[in-house]
């Protein structure tokens, strides 16, 4: 018997995920309104955990208030204070590499798998860790906000496994399997699932996905 989520997601495509990302994801819309250097966006993504507010609101505030690395220090102290010492240490670890990424942003946009590995190495983490792969997603959003054309996410990069996705299935291998069966990269699957409860007047296939997720 076919997995019900796979059956529903087979009705979608990368183009559907692209539509959601460009038109409905408030994190991208915030960066589109106030584009930022990609290194600064990655730095914020690396500390985007244990937030005290919805992620959409956090990124909207970031886009409005942060224009430099020094701004980010002040911002995290005020708006992202949980585990503050750990987050400040993560910023310090990343800081020496921010210019390297900025100078090579086009290379990394063409080779997001390489950026995935580079971030994991410098942060001493696994390439599948949630903050690492989420940073890739936000890096791509930052590039699009700067005017670069859309590039699909690579199939090799994992989905950011947060509590909502863990309710469906906590095993990353399951999500790679879903990706393979639906021909949608994991980060684009995240885009289809993550904002689904905030979309009104849903087309039928989105409504089916929302109904399935609501009943879990």
Swiss-Prot record:
InterPro entries: AGOG (IPR016544), AGOG-like (IPR015254), DNA_glycosylase (IPR011257). The active site is at 130 (schiff-base intermediate with dna), 162. It catalyses: 2'-deoxyribonucleotide-(2'-deoxyribose 5'-phosphate)-2'-deoxyribonucleotide-DNA = a 3'-end 2'-deoxyribonucleotide-(2,3-dehydro-2,3-deoxyribose 5'-phosphate)-DNA + a 5'-end 5'-phospho-2'-deoxyribonucleoside-DNA + H(+). One of its GO terms (biological process) is base-excision repair. SUPFAM superfamilies: DNA-glycosylase. Keywords: DNA damage, DNA excision, DNA repair, Hydrolase, Lyase. Residues 106-170 are annotated as: Helix-hairpin-helix. 8-oxoguanine binds at residues 27, 48, 59, 134, 160, 190, 194. GO terms for molecular function: class I DNA-(apurinic or apyrimidinic site) endonuclease activity; oxidized base lesion DNA N-glycosylase activity. Its EC number is 3.2.2.-, 4.2.99.18. Belongs to the archaeal N-glycosylase/DNA lyase (AGOG) family. HAMAP family: AGOG (MF_01168). Contains two alpha-helical subdomains, with the 8-oxoguanine binding site located in a cleft at their interface. Contains a helix-hairpin-helix (HhH) structural motif and a Gly/Pro-rich sequence followed by a conserved Asp (HhH-GPD motif). DNA repair enzyme that is part of the base excision repair (BER) pathway; protects from oxidative damage by removing the major product of DNA oxidation, 8-oxoguanine (GO), from single- and double-stranded DNA substrates. This is N-glycosylase/DNA lyase. It comes from Nanoarchaeum equitans (strain Kin4-M).
């Amino acid at each position: 018997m076919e997995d019900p989520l796979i059956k529903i997601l087979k009705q979608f495509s990368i183009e559907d995920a692209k539509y959601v990302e460009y038109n409905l994801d408030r994190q991208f819309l915030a960066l589109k309104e106030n584009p930022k250097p990609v290194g600064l966006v990655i730095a914020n993504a690396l500390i985007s955990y244990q937030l005290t507010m919805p992620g959409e609101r956090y990124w909207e505030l970031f886009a409005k208030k942060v224009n430099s690395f020094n701004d980010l220090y002040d911002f995290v102290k005020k708006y992202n204070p949980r585990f503050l010492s750990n987050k400040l240490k993560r910023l310090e670890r990343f800081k020496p590499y921010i210019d390297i990424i900025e100078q090579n942003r086009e290379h990394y946009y063409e080779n997001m798998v390489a950026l995935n590995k580079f971030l994991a190495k410098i942060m001493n983490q696994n390439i599948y860790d949630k903050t690492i792969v989420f940073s890739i997603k936000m890096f791509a959003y930052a590039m699009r906000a700067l005017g670069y054309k859309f590039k699909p996410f690579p199939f090799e990069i994992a989905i950011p496994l947060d509590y909502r996705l863990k309710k469906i299935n906590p095993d990353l291998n399951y999500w790679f399997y879903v990706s393979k069966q639906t021909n949608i990269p994991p980060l684009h699957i995240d885009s289809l699932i993550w904002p689904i409860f905030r979309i009104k007047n849903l087309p039928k296939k989105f409504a089916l996905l929302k109904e399935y997720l609501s009943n879990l």
